[in-house]
Structures are given as C-alpha cells and as structure tokens.
C-alpha cells in the first residue's frame, strides 16, 4: 500500500496484521524489523512477552458451523509443513463443491515439484465455513456479496488482484487447525488471486488458468517468489530502487 498511488500521495491507512511465533516457555523480547531503502533490516518495534501474564488470551476456538477436512494427513504437525485451505464465497448448499474443489487443487499441488516428491512432508487441511452469499466482490462491476473472509477483486486498485483486509476473520478461521501457510479458495470463475510472503495467498476456482494460479500464488506467499511483471500492471510503484538487489528469488 505504501508504494501504491494512495500511499505515495500521502493517504494513510492502517492494516490489521498477525505474527505467528512458537509459544515461548519464558519471557522473550519480541522484535519487528523492516527493510529500508537500502534493503537493510532496521528494528521498528520491540516489546516483552511473558507467557505467564494474565493478559495472554487463552480462548478456545469454537464454531458449530465450521467443518474440517483432511485431504492429506501425514502425521505430527510439528514435523510437517501444514497448509490450510479456507473456504470463501461458498454457501451452505455449496459445501460439496468446496470439497470437490479442495481435492482438485490438492491434486494440482502435488503434480508439481518439489512438492510431488516431498508429499509425505505435508499435511493439508480444508476449513469450511459457509458464506451468506456465493462468490466475491467485484467493485468494477458494482457487485458486492456477503462472504466470510471479505475478499475483493480490485484490491489496491488492480483489477485482477484478489485479496482481503479482514485479517481477523481469516486468522480466526485458520485457527481451527495447525498451519504454516494459508490459502483462501475463492468460489468464482474470474481469473484472479494474490500472495503476500509469510501471510496468505488467494486463488479463484473456476478459470482456465486455475492450476497455474494455485501454485504460482503459493510461490509468492510461501517461498518468497518476487513480483516481476514487466508485461502487466501491478498495484505499486518502484517497490525496489534501481540500485538495490531484491532479496526475493
């Protein structure tokens, strides 16, 4: 956002975000760093975390409308890469479609290397929570629907960029299973998706490039694949200075 048109023009905005860390056994210093214009990490936030503090919330997740599927179950989550695929834009009557789509995309995932030869190192979970309405928002067509994760096309001004700013709903739904990576499976025929490194990625289910889209967006969110779209527009401007070598592969 900061390098997009609004951010560059001084329009400020806040984003709800989450950091996932192992539960500490003792007090720790929690530090956040960000890269400066020279691509060097600089500390910008620090706090102490005491796992025994009375202010550590220990709520248990509970929602009778949520159903969990396990299309790939290879054992102890502590020893596997755990991927959760969240349902978005599926109504209660479309649960079977979610399951069919889930199994189809899991199949696509393991057609590709290095995942194909490492399948035993993964667990994949599907988490279904019905939306009130089917699909996702299309602001350019004046279409807005009521869905669980509030995804939308035209994110950050890019027509094909399909994302959500509702981090809280996404994390609350993902919390029903162990996870290292989050996919949002959006029930829609239009081509679109997105991926943010160490955050989440999205993809639509029913377009002709769905197989490519599924693995491509995972590359952005899980393996740090860089944006190098010199043939098409992106949602930001001059993210890297010409004199700086990106760290992304």
Walk through the language-model features, giving the residues of each:
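Active-site-proximal segments of metallohydrolase catalytic domains
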Residues: 121-197
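Structural recognition of the beta-strand scaffold that forms the well-ordered cores
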Residues: 82-86, 123-126, 181-185, 213-214, ...
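Fold-level signature of zinc-dependent metallopeptidase catalytic domains
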Residues: 60-111, 126-134
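Short pre-active-site segment immediately N-terminal to the catalytic Zn-binding motif
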Residues: 97-98, 193-217
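Beta-strand-enriched, solvent-exposed domains that form extended recognition/catalytic surfaces
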Residues: 1-61
